[in-house]
């Protein structure tokens, strides 16, 4: 089929069907370009091809940067040029001009925020052609959701739900559209807006029972821990990060769900991120992958929004110890308001010396002077353990002590370098 797609219309349509069924097919772009060259003015072929290319583009999670020139770009160009070649009657035909415009709009959405203005125009034109198509309203809602415009996302999904519900009531049982994606996005948008009652109504239609929390958000009890993927940048303090400071990467954090789409971050970030331990966050309903953790499949969801920053103070530290576990033993002496998280511990040398990095996680209402006293007392009682937490003294307004802590940080890293625990700078 692939060697004929640019000359044989049947082969072109068969190719579009192939990649719709198998969007991970390794050979897509070059044959698709030949189809566009051969049948760019054929609306049926371009509708099928652009829709299939969108399935390919969807294989890349929406929290990842789009390809500079990928399947969405090819679909957008094909749909746009074909639409421009239509006659007036075809342009306003939902089955022709309408589908070309919605495929163009979806392609532009997947190409990134810099194309949002053109995407909005394409969605508006598609809906002007056929405002009764519930799925087109749903797709407009996806654009608004991923750009953080949750009021507009809620409005679009409510319109989608009304139209698809009406279509479902008129269809035979086997032909009824699934309302699940729309209900999920209704719940997500309502949660983002603090409209907990509306979110609960959507969850209940999906068979999820919950209640309203004191904050007016949905609460579903006994949900298992899940994971959240967040983009991170380098931290300007410390040499534990092997990546360049401006390199963007992902970290996977544990979250405790409060509902199927929001919850509290339970692990601190290693690098700098928009979220951290204690934040209440919103995530999308489609996991980017599944992780196997202790025999359980754990979904990893992409971050959508921060609903409420946590009150906790997350203070970075660096330390060295001669006996493994000394720093963890110290944590028990800092009080119930303080947790200690070590996320990077280097392999010890022959004498057992090791360097480690982590964060102190301090309750928002904790007395920092008491934490300082407890920390300094515990450190004095432990030979072979050194720790530098400059930001603790900065928060206390003790500039001289903060300066000494910064110097201690550098001293710890230089000592680790001499021992071969860190690469030489």
Predicted regions and their residues:
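Residue at a conserved register position within TPR or TPR-like alpha-solenoid repeats
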Residues: 2, 36, 53, 73, ...
């Amino acid at each position: 089929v692939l060697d004929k797609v640019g000359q044989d219309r049947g082969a072109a349509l068969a190719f579009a069907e192939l990649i719709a069924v198998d969007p991970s097919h390794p050979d897509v772009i070059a044959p698709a370009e030949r189809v566009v060259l051969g049948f760019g003015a054929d609306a049926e072929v371009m509708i099928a091809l652009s829709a299939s290319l969108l399935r390919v583009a969807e294989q890349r999670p929406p929290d990842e940067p789009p390809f500079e020139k990928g399947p969405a770009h090819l679909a957008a160009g094909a749909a746009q040029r074909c639409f421009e070649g239509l006659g007036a009657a075809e342009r306003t035909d939902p089955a022709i001009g309408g589908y070309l415009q919605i495929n163009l709009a979806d392609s532009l959405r997947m190409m990134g925020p810099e194309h949002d203005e053109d995407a909005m125009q394409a969605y508006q034109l598609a809906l002007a052609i056929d405002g009764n198509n519930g799925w087109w309203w749903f797709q407009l809602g996806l654009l608004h959701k991923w750009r953080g415009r949750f009021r507009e996302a809620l409005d679009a999904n409510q319109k989608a739900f009304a139209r698809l519900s009406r279509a479902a009531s008129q269809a035979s049982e086997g032909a009824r559209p699934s309302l699940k994606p729309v209900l999920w996005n209704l719940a997500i948008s309502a949660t983002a807006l603090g409209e907990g009652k509306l979110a609960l109504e959507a969850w209940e239609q999906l068979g999820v029972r919950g209640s309203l929390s004191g904050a007016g958000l949905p609460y579903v009890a006994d949900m298992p821990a899940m994971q959240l993927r967040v983009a991170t940048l380098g931290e300007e303090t410390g040499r534990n990060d092997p990546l360049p400071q401006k390199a963007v990467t992902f970290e996977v954090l544990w979250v405790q769900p409060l509902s199927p789409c929001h919850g509290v971050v339970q692990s601190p970030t290693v690098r700098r991120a928009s979220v951290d331990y204690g934040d209440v966050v919103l995530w999308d309903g489609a996991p980017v992958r599944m992780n196997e953790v202790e025999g359980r499949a754990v979904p990893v969801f992409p971050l959508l929004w921060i609903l409420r920053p946590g009150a906790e103070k997350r203070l970075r530290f660096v330390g060295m110890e001669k006996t493994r576990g000394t720093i963890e033993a110290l944590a028990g002496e800092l009080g119930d308001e303080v947790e200690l998280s070590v996320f990077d511990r280097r392999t010890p040398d022959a004498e057992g010396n090791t360097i480690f990095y982590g964060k102190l996680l301090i309750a928002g209402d904790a007395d920092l002077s008491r934490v300082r006293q407890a920390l300094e007392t515990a450190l004095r009682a432990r030979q072979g353990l050194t720790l530098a937490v400059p930001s603790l003294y900065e928060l206390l307004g003790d500039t001289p002590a903060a300066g000494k802590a910064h110097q201690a940080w550098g001293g710890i890293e230089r000592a680790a370098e001499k021992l071969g625990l860190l690469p030489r700078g």
